[in-house]
Each structure stands twice: as C-alpha cells, then as structure tokens.
C-alpha cells in the first residue's frame, strides 16, 4: 500500500498550527467554489459539490464559509476568482514521482512556487507525460475503522463498482473507477457506514520503497509544496512502513 495514501489520511490531524489550519480551510473552500462553478450550486444534482461540501464539513470548516463559497461559485454572490486547474509533474528525492495539482488564478505564480519548492528540497520539474503515466485516476473513499470491519465495507461496496478495499491502519481505503464513486459512496450510506471523504484522486501503479531518511525528505518536500496557496493536492508514489510513518509523524 502506498505510504502516501496513509500519510494523506493523517496529515490533517497534524494541522495544529493556526496557519496550517487556515490554509487547509482556504483550500477546502476553494474546492467547494470551483465545484459549484463547474456543475451548479445544487449538491443534489452535483455529486462533486456534494463531496466537496462533506469534506469541508468533516474538517470543521464553518457552514457560513461553505455557503458563501457555493454562492460565489454559482454566481449568486460577487467575489469569485477565475480559478484554473493546472497539473505539474516532477520528481522528489530518491526518484519519487510527483503530480502537483494546482487550483490557481495566476499560472505563472503557481509554476514559480512549485519549481522553487522542488529545487530547494532535492526535487526537479519533469516533462509533461514523464510522470503522469505512473498514476491512474480513481474514486477514493476513506472509511474510519471505528465500529466497522473490512468485511462490512466489502459487503457494502462490492456490487456498487468497488475494485478493492485497502487497510491503511486507522482507516479503510475503497478504490473504484471515478464514474462509480457516487454509487460506492451511496452504498456505504445505505449500509449505515460512515465515511471520512469521497473524491476523485490519483493513485500510483508502482511505489518506491523509502528508508527513514528518504521518507523524511519527501514528507518535507510535500509539506513545502502544500504550503503554497495554489497547490490543492500532491500525489506521490513512495512507500513506507506504518512504524516509520508513526515515528516521523
């Protein structure tokens, strides 16, 4: 199992510093605004917006902030920015492949910040297509282990299009084709199983095993990249043990 998947499910628990928490809130709100602009402001008819709102709520973003983001995105309130999605490819220390997804209103600024973060932390920019082939777009649902078992999750999602269920330590990861994400999420809801997040994500097909020094370097690079207001998600193909991740956490 990819070490980055495990890291991604726990990193929000590390956002104890107000500045980090504020950045996380801003990115979740931006996600809601863009989802509303792309597919309309009604969550019932816009599954991407529904999932963005649920993720924001589960990370304690105030409802008022969420509501305003929906209104800005759907044109009911002024102040929305013209955000564009840009994907940059790169390598981190030890040849770890990186896809850096930006949601920005200034492509030049985003590219400069990503390039600076990479070069200052043992990474490098990569040509388009040289990294992306190592990842596949998947629907990813994270389910907390509390009160449920892997068999419960499997039983609920198997007929809904789920491809596999992975044990991430404190949670289960359910993978599907992106088009089956809503069906999988709905199947869990129908079975009374709470989920932490449901979203389209990029999952690596191969992983690079890292020792503790290598893991420390790549996690530092990811932290620096995610510190940029323009960077929404960083996908990486490293693999580390649960024990090592706990020590570094």
From Swiss-Prot:
Q: Where in the cell is it found?
A: Cytoplasm
Q: Please name the source species.
A: Salinispora arenicola (strain CNS-205)
Keyword rRNA processing attached = no
Q: Which HAMAP family match?
A: Transcrip_reg_TACO1
Any one Gene Ontology molecular-function term assigned to this protein's record: DNA binding
Which is a GO BP term held by this UniProt record?
A: regulation of DNA-templated transcription
The family database entries (InterPro entries) matched by this protein are listed as: Integrase-like_N, TACO1_YebC-like_2nd/3rd_dom, TACO1_YebC_N, Transcrip_reg_TACO1-like, Transcrip_reg_TACO1-like_dom3, YebC-like
Q: Does the keyword Transcription apply?
A: yes
The entry's family comment says:
Belongs to the TACO1 family.
Q: Name the UniProt key words of this record, in alphabetical order.
A: Cytoplasm, DNA-binding, Transcription, Transcription regulation
Sorted alphabetically, the Gene Ontology cellular component annotations on this record are: cytosol
What's the protein name? Probable transcriptional regulatory protein Sare_1779
């Amino acid at each position: 199992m990819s070490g980055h998947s495990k890291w991604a499910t726990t990193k929000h628990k590390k956002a104890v510093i107000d500045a980090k928490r504020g950045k996380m809130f801003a990115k979740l709100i931006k996600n809601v605004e863009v989802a509303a602009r792309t597919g309309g402001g009604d969550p019932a008819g816009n599954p991407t917006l529904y999932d963005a709102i649920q993720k924001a709520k589960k990370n304690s973003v105030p409802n008022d902030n969420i509501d305003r983001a929906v209104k800005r995105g759907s044109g009911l309130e002024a102040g929305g920015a013209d955000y564009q999605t840009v994907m940059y490819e790169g390598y981190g220390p030890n040849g770890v492949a990186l896809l850096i997804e930006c949601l920005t209103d200034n492509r030049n600024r985003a590219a400069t910040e990503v390039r600076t973060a990479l070069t200052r932390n043992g990474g490098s920019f990569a040509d388009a297509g040289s990294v992306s082939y190592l990842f596949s777009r998947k629907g990813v649902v994270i389910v907390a282990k509390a009160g449920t078992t892997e068999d419960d999750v499997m039983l609920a999602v198997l007929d809904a299009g789920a491809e596999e269920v992975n044990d991430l330590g404190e949670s289960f990861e359910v993978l599907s084709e992106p088009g089956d994400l809503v069906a999988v999420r709905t199947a869990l809801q129908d079975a009374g199983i709470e989920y932490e997040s449901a979203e389209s994500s990029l999952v690596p097909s191969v992983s690079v095993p890292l020792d503790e020094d290598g893991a420390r370097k790549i996690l530092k690079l990811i932290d620096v990249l995610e510190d940029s207001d323009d960077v929404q998600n960083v996908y990486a193909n490293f693999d580390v043990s649960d024990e090592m991740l706990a020590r570094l956490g």
